[in-house]
Structures are given as C-alpha cells and as structure tokens.
Amino acid sequence: MKYRALVLSMLLVLPSSCGWQLRDTQLVPSAIGTLYLSSSDRNSALITELERALSINGIKVIADKAAADYSVIIVDYRQNSRTASINPSGRVAEYQLNEDVDFIIADAQGNEMIPLSTASVERVYEFNEDDILSSSNESRSVRDRMHEEIVRQILNRLRVFSDNATP
C-alpha cells in the first residue's frame, strides 16, 4: 500500500517539477486588474481567443479604456500563406501559413509598459487537391492553433511584465 502511495505521489509531482503544465493554464497574475483590448477588428477570431484566455486567467476585459488599469493595443495583424512545396506534377503539396501580431501594452495613462512587440507563428500543412473540403478544414484548424499560440505569446509578455512590476 505504501508503495502504491509513493508511486502515485511521484506521478503527480514529476510533471510539475519539470515545468509541464496543461494548456491554457499559463498563470497571468490577476494583479493586472482590468484590461482594455484595442483592435481595428474587434470580431476577429484572434481577439475572441485572447478575451477567452484572459478571462480564464481571471483578468477582466472591459470596454471602457479610461477605466482600465492596462491596455493591450493590437497595432497590426498580418496573415499570409504561400506555397511551401509542390508535388511531382507541379501542383501545390503544402502551404505555409504565417501570422504576426504587433502589439503594445500600456498603463492607464497611456505610457508604454511594453513597447511595440511582435508575436509570430508559422505552420505548414499538407494540401490534398483531391479533397478540397478536408484541406480547407485542415487550414482552419491550423489557423485556430496559430491563434492559440499567438495568444500564449501575448499572455507570456503580460506575465513577465506583471512579474517585473510587482516588488
């Protein structure tokens, strides 16, 4: 019985000791308080994912910039796709997708706490010309995962900022 308890406790402790954590459990201290998101496209999938992740981390996103403790300003959002490889018949075999988000984190007075930074992600997916629907679904799924990665990069900057801001 003691052996089972020891093995069970080791299985619980080892993953956390190596830094492993579940996705979307990146801790951003709630000491950040309230946050205002500024973007030219408030209805984009990226902004929706960012709002969801902030909410999960206990940060309240508000619509009034003047009442917010901090602002995340999305300056530019770029999506790009290009042919990554071609098959022997000269048709597209893979596409490369790129997304870049330029952002600034500012305090309530508008002072830049984190100057212009870029979150970038690049992925390649196989394109099957015989099954356009499945290739389209694959592209959408890859884009969704890319949004999650960009959001993680922005949250990481917020976490580092909040760690450095607290004494």
Regions found by a protein language model. Give the residues of each.
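A structural "domain/chain start" motif
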Residues: 14-59, 162-167
